[in-house]
């Protein structure tokens, strides 16, 4: 029955002179998310956007599933748009209301409220009069109701605008943030763990177009470990509908670097030296990608190695771009709950090894100094090892909706 999806955006609306740039980006990102669904032109007017719908519930399920993942959106409402004629509005408001009642199958008396907004001042009734007319009409036709203006179970909203009247009962939350691509590009150091996918998601939420970079130590780490990172990339691709759409994953073959570290460096410094290589390569990749930042899933104090000394030793002088650590202020519980919401948690907890866990020394240095780290690195042919690993780099693109199954759709309408 719904013929439009109303889109509300938050922070973009505060952007002053740059507002239209952010609005256009949001429209483009929504178009990109919906590109294979034969949706009509998205309209943008008076601080709102409208996606035309065909009326089929299957289409609405898909559109909701995709659009609520597009960053920049605060809330969305499936709505019925009709001509601004009193009798037509009454009839449709009742239908929309009954439709909502059917979806909640109430046991007891249901409370409701009508909230009408008249933006079109040429319409003959004002908002208060419309609230009364529509409230009375619904009470007359649906048994077992009561009006509650403070905490109604059902809020029927009616917006009388110049181009027609929109009627709806639901406000479904999006993730907020800014449209991807509006703040630049970043390279995300993506492991198979719980944290880095969440860090990448948070960077995407702030409008950064993220490219994943994974270090893989085949045959020490298995193909199944790599598959885990690919599956995470697939999930992230569903939020990544920026200017180019989808998600790009760069895989760096790290085996020879790890072997060299094991052979020549002090055992307690293995992890620090390995991380310093990773940051150096991430910086190189960021330059190649014309990215402006390196994003990591590091936390402060979550594990023994995540000390400020260690962060300094692994990245100082090898990264010349800002490093974003979006998880720095979050507790593990908060990160896990975010990973569940995003849909990466179940993949991240699959029990496959990762190159860091495999090469874990018995007594890793938790507060390494920069000098000590540089001394260890000087035992290796740093540049040559990096160049060799870069030659074996692979790139894979993940399209957001190519393999999505019915079960994976989050909306059921
Ligand atoms: N194999 C890898 N490939 C790419 N980045 C990695 C890899 N291993 C670690 N990193 C980066 O280093 C960060 C810190 O890793 P560490 O193992 O200390 O923490 P973690 O809390 O286990 O992180 P995660 O849960 O993301 O694996 C990761 O969040 C990620 O950004």
From Swiss-Prot:
It catalyses: [ThiI sulfur-carrier protein]-S-sulfanyl-L-cysteine + a uridine in tRNA + 2 reduced [2Fe-2S]-[ferredoxin] + ATP + H(+) = [ThiI sulfur-carrier protein]-L-cysteine + a 4-thiouridine in tRNA + 2 oxidized [2Fe-2S]-[ferredoxin] + AMP + diphosphate; [ThiS sulfur-carrier protein]-C-terminal Gly-Gly-AMP + S-sulfanyl-L-cysteinyl-[cysteine desulfurase] + AH2 = [ThiS sulfur-carrier protein]-C-terminal-Gly-aminoethanethioate + L-cysteinyl-[cysteine desulfurase] + A + AMP + 2 H(+). It holds the Pfam family ThiI. It is an enzyme of class 2 (transferase). The keyword Membrane does not apply. GO terms for cellular component: cytosol. Its EC number is 2.8.1.4. One of its GO terms (biological process) is thiamine biosynthetic process. SMART domains: THUMP. ATP binds at residues 189-190, 214-215, 275, 297, 306. The keyword Repressor does not apply. GO terms for molecular function: ATP binding; CCA tRNA nucleotidyltransferase activity; tRNA binding; tRNA-uracil-4 sulfurtransferase activity. Keywords: ATP-binding, Cytoplasm, Nucleotide-binding, RNA-binding, Thiamine biosynthesis, Transferase, tRNA-binding. Its main location: cytoplasm. Disulfide bonds: none annotated. It is found in: Cytoplasm. Residues 61-171 form the THUMP domain. PROSITE patterns: THUMP. Catalyzes the ATP-dependent transfer of a sulfur to tRNA to produce 4-thiouridine in position 8 of tRNAs, which functions as a near-UV photosensor. Also catalyzes the transfer of sulfur to the sulfur carrier protein ThiS, forming ThiS-thiocarboxylate. This is a step in the synthesis of thiazole, in the thiamine biosynthesis pathway. The sulfur is donated as persulfide by IscS. Belongs to the ThiI family. This is Probable tRNA sulfurtransferase. The gene is thiI.
